[in-house]
A protein has these predicted regions:
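Conserved glycine-rich beta-strand-loop-beta hairpin in the small C-terminal domain of fold type I
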Residues: 140, 155-165, 177-190, 222
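Conserved core segment of the aminotransferase class I/II
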Residues: 81-82, 86-158, 166, 249
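Active-site phosphate-binding strand-loop segment of PLP-dependent enzymes
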Residues: 4-73
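Short amphipathic alpha-helical/adjacent loop interface patches that line ligand
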Residues: 60, 154, 161, 241
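A generic structural signal for well-ordered alpha-helical segments
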Residues: 51, 81, 168, 204-205
Length: 256
């Protein structure tokens, strides 16, 4: 139950409570994918109060937690309340931060012993056992020795986002970029262009030869949006932006 307003998203808590009345599990994502919203402490406490009131278990997806790009702090919801710590699963991974999904490393924090043992039993039944040979040494090295690199990476991505915003403001000002607090993703509103998703896909994917994620991939609430990944070398980013601009000119039968 997210509401889009003035290039930002907020939660409709009245609707959320209605959903909680008929739910056993709530999936929280922070920073949120695809919008990049980091839910602040005040919002998380409201979610906690609803979860306690309706006895809802929380699965918190925090895999983008390292990509907090503003002054807003990221909180693990389990750190804010003892009841939630015992009724939640926190999902973390270095895969996003260090671009190593191939190592299949993830960390799950399940403080409730009974739930943790049930979860491990189900994982074993599915044939998911020990991490591969490289995973443990990799995760130890990444978390112990790579802090400076992560700081540099966050600043680089922050500047990449700024470049994209400035570029679109100059060349395609009808694109509205959602204000985000984290992740290396941009959630872009193209409704002012008065084109449908098929036309958008033809423009960016075919004419421009740039791959973006279409809003419909995220459900009906994604209509009129697309998601763009900016975690790339700046030279490649500028090439992609110029391709998008040139494709837009072709779409509108204008000179490149």
């Amino acid at each position: 139950p997210l509401v889009y307003e003035n290039r930002k998203y907020h939660i409709d808590f009245h609707l959320l409570e209605e959903c909680f009345k008929h739910s056993k599990v709530f999936v929280l994502i922070s920073p949120h994918n695809p919008t990049g919203t980091i839910w602040n402490k005040e919002v998380l406490i409201k979610i906690i109060n609803l979860a306690k009131k309706h006895n809802v278990f929380i699965i918190s997806d925090d895999v983008h937690a390292d990509f907090t790009l503003t002054n807003d702090s990221h909180y693990l919801i389990s750190s804010l309340d003892e009841w939630v710590a015992n009724h939640s699963m926190i999902c973390l991974s270095p895969a996003k931060t260090f671009n190593i999904p191939g190592l299949e490393i993830a960390n799950l924090i399940i403080e409730n012993k009974e739930i943790r043992e049930k979860f491990i039993k189900e994982m074993m039944a599915l044939g998911i056992h020990n991490p591969n040979y490289f995973s443990i040494p990799a995760i130890i090295s990444l978390y112990k020795y790579c802090t400076d690199w992560v700081i540099y990476l966050k600043e680089y991505i922050k500047n990449n986002k700024k470049i994209v915003k400035e570029f679109f403001n100059e060349y395609i000002p009808l694109l509205d970029i959602t204000e985000s607090d984290g992740t290396y993703l941009l959630w872009i509103n193209y409704k002012k262009l008065s084109i449908n998703e098929n036309e958008l896909a033809y423009w960016i994917n075919n004419l421009s030869r740039v791959k973006v994620s279409l809003g419909s991939e995220f459900g009906k609430e994604g209509d009129g949006f697309f998601r763009m990944n900016v975690a790339m070398p700046r030279e490649k980013l500028l090439e992609a932006l110029n391709r998008i601009k040139n494709g837009f000119c072709l779409l509108n039968n204008r000179e490149i």
